[in-house]
Amino acid sequence: MFQFELKKWIQKLNSTLSLFVSLLARLRTMKINTSSLAEQIYLVGPGSLNITLLTACFISMVFTMQIAKEFLHLDAASALGAVIVIAFTRELSPVLTAVIIAGKIGSSFTAEIATMETTEQIDALYLLNTNPIDYLVFPKVAACCIMLPILSTISLTASIAISIFVSFVMYGIPSSIFLKSAFLALSVSDFFSCLQKSLCFGTIIAFISCQWGLTSSGGAKGVGNSTTSSVVTILLTIFITDFILSYFMFQSTGSSIAQGNNL
């Protein structure tokens, strides 16, 4: 049973890569549905902003509470800003934003396309001489690739602001000390790595959710199974990709805090 599920999962991942190649091949001749693109951008961006901000704020509160008291105990409050800002810029903001979008938007994409596949609406598109990649897949991919970096940037800004507030109100750490250590340790490449990760995660969310919907079968039960499998696969792929990207981006950079202290 496990071998069968693993084989099926690998086949779907291969078909996702094929979908990626097919979309790239059609970019020059593609008929872009601007209204659908605008709708998807709103769904992924403004439609997901509230939950993204709430999650970022509360995660930042908890993370700051746990880190700040330990740093005060070690008499290392001057390094608090550097650690928190680096953690959110390099890892937490892009990953948490991607997880939220995977659960909210990825599941929606899969359920929508799977329902269309089950009710033969995909076949109807072919009869109308409309390629599903143009009409369904591209707007979703473009929306995720455009909005994930923007949402991650907003999430990062909110997380840092909340962290500064909690550090001052609960532990008496001045914002000047927090920001000084943060700016000394943070580099432009760290911010660009956040954007690059967000772009990769947006691509993963869009392609996997669309492909799992296009290959759905088995009626209403199949729609549910495809949606669940889609989200699980997206999350697993995001975590694996995050490790690979982090390894190549940061493994050889050395300590940012030590470099900041030397300035």
Curated annotation (Swiss-Prot):
It is a multi-pass membrane protein. It is found in: Plastid, Chloroplast membrane. The chain crosses the membrane at residues 43-63, 82-102, 136-156, 159-179, 199-219, 230-250. GO terms for cellular component: ATP-binding cassette (ABC) transporter complex; chloroplast membrane. InterPro entries: ABC_MlaE_roteobac (IPR003453), Permease_MalE (IPR030802). Pfam families: MlaE (PF02405). One of its GO terms (molecular function) is phospholipid transporter activity. Keywords: Chloroplast, Membrane, Plastid, Transmembrane, Transmembrane helix, Transport. Could be part of an ABC transporter complex. PANTHER family: ABC TRANSPORTER PERMEASE PROTEIN-RELATED (PTHR30188), PROTEIN TRIGALACTOSYLDIACYLGLYCEROL 1, CHLOROPLASTIC (PTHR30188:SF4). Belongs to the MlaE permease family. This is Probable ABC transporter permease protein ycf63. It comes from Porphyra purpurea. The lineage of its organism: Eukaryota, Rhodophyta, Bangiophyceae, Bangiales, Bangiaceae.
